[in-house]
């Protein structure tokens, strides 16, 4: 008799859960959704799925606005930061050269080392001969000088300094090769299945590839788990070495786009122009990734188009928090008359 009552209770609850459009019982997880401006809830269940196919046109549940946005970049993606929901995609799994957007992973590992206590912002970082030989963007480190982690992060985030990137990698892992192993391990943990890192800075190297989807994943991890990084990624102009070294952010959106919070630019002759751009407006945080844009102007313009599309068509609402009681349900023919 007791067993039959329990069965009736379970069946009743199941029916109620599927019929009534109300959040019931205690929330076991944060109930977070993305809503479009027509009032329709956007499903977030596929936010990290590996089932998304190579192109947005062929993938399931990946909105594609290529025709209306007119993007010329080889690959692009727009995601909502809190849920990871894909709001737009174009060739999101195409493997391309990331250039200095690679440094998002380098910065992530630095921030994780700080949060774990293995590193502090005040630690002094030496510069090796190897670090001084880096080409591309740099602040011309000298083997006789040391900079703090705080200063190194500023140089990496603002001017994409390759010499500082290598110095940090060597300090954390003993060598750049060992650090790259850590980068690839972390990429696998994040489900970045399109990615193979060959270096920590992003200069062109055969086999050093990733996708806009994967860049969005590591960007999301960095911004969500380590929001303090925005202290660096939102700097427009600053200086080092007692004002002798001037820094101007390579990400022009920091100056020109309302709500911009980062994140990282990258370009080489082979990669063309890349960008991971983040912004927040009205509690909605978005990440737009552009890869293989024809010109630097195109990458910023097209990132703006993606962000504008997101802010104009979606909004963010948190309906309940974990453990919060949000309602009661009447139980028919059950031991208890209602459950919370």
Predicted regions and their residues:
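Extended aliphatic helical segments
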Residues: 2, 11, 34, 62, ...
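Active-site-adjacent loops and short helices of periplasmic peptidoglycan-processing enzymes
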Residues: 27-226
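Basic side chains
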Residues: 5-8, 90, 103, 186, ...
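Domain-terminus/edge residues, biased toward the C-terminal soluble/receptor-binding domains
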Residues: 5, 192-196, 204-340
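N-terminal secretory targeting signals
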Residues: 1-73, 319-340
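A generic structural signal for short, solvent-exposed coil/turn residues
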Residues: 11, 19, 68-70, 117-119, ...
């Amino acid at each position: 008799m007791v067993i039959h009552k329990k069965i009736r209770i379970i069946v009743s609850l199941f029916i109620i859960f599927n019929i009534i459009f109300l959040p019931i019982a205690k929330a076991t997880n944060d109930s977070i959704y993305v809503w479009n401006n027509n009032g329709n809830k956007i499903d977030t269940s596929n936010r990290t799925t590996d089932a998304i196919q190579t192109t947005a046109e062929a993938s399931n549940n990946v909105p594609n606005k290529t025709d209306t946005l007119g993007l010329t970049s080889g690959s692009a993606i727009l995601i909502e930061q809190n849920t990871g929901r894909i709001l737009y995609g174009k060739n999101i799994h195409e493997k391309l050269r990331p250039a200095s957007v690679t440094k998002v992973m380098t910065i992530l590992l630095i921030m994780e080392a700080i949060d774990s206590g293995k590193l502090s912002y005040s630690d002094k970082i030496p510069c090796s001969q190897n670090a001084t030989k880096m080409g591309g963007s740099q602040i011309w480190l000298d083997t006789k000088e040391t900079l703090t982690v705080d200063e190194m992060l500023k140089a990496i985030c603002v001017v994409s300094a390759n010499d500082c990137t290598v110095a940090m990698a060597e300090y954390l892992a003993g060598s750049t090769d060992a650090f790259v192993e850590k980068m690839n391990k972390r990429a696998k943990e994040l489900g970045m299945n399109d990615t193979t890192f060959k270096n920590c800075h992003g200069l062109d190297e055969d086999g050093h590839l990733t996708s806009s989807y994967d860049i969005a994943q590591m960007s999301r991890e960095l911004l969500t788990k380590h929001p303090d990084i925005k202290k660096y990624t939102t700097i427009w102009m600053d200086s080092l070495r007692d004002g002798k070294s001037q820094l101007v952010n390579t990400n022009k959106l920091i100056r020109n786009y309302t709500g911009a919070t980062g994140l990282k630019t990258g370009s080489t002759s082979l990669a063309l122009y890349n960008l991971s751009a983040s912004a927040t407006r009205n509690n909605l945080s978005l990440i737009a990734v552009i890869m293989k844009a024809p010109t630097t102007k195109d990458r910023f313009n097209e990132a703006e188009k993606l962000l504008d599309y997101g802010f104009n068509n979606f909004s963010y609402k948190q309906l309940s928090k974990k453990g919060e009681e949000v309602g009661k349900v009447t139980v028919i023919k059950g031991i208890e008359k209602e459950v919370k």
